[in-house]
Amino acid sequence: MAKKRNTSKGLQALIDGKFIVHNDSFYKAIVAAATPDGTGPSPLEEDFEANFPDPLKFLPPKGDEPTERGETAYVPNPNRQDMFDGYTFVFYEQRQHSTLFAPISEGHGKVLFREVIPDETTVDDFVRYVKDVAGEKGLGEFEDGSEGKGVVVVRFNPVKGAGSEWFADFSRQVAQYLDHRLIEQNEFLDAILGNDASVLRRPLLPESSGIVAPPPTAGKCSLTQYLIPS
């Protein structure tokens, strides 16, 4: 259970083929269904399948993640379990790496961390590292044009505090060197719901400054299908 949709455990649940539900309201619905009405049996005792709360009616509230998908997109999909196979995600901020390590790994993707220190790490050094991960040399763009499976760089964008301007400039330069759109952390939810990791790996648009918005998005169950993340 969760209070938000776009959490590490929530994403992992979707990869694993589980529902995600809002903790308080779903608990209350189960308690109500399990409580006898007067002297008769409880609704669950009367007909478990018919009276068990529909998890899609108890989704956690929406956050600021860029997705407009309806509730049916949250139905467990076993095909998501290997959706990141062939993709390598490079992080340069430790908390982002820790947050997304489990769901990406669960989806058979690779997760790497390369520390970046403001005013110390150079764009050239980072680009060389990313290209080396991709099995390429030099400082130019990806040889495959950032299309299909391959390496994806996850952008770190602190909105305030020391280093915020430095990181913004760093990400722009990396994107331009690689001709590669650096993705935002909150884009993973929509990709997982659509079972399409390819939307996370795209070339930089010519008119872009390095930040490109993602494209618009268009049963019976057992208790083991539910994840209640903390």
Q: What is the role of each PLM region?
A:
Residues M1-K57, R95-P229:
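BRCT (BRCA1 C-terminal) domain core and associated BRCT-interaction motifs
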Residues D47-P76:
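Short N-terminal or domain-adjacent regulatory/targeting segments
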Residues R80-G86:
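Short, low-complexity disordered segments enriched in Ser/Pro/Gly and basic
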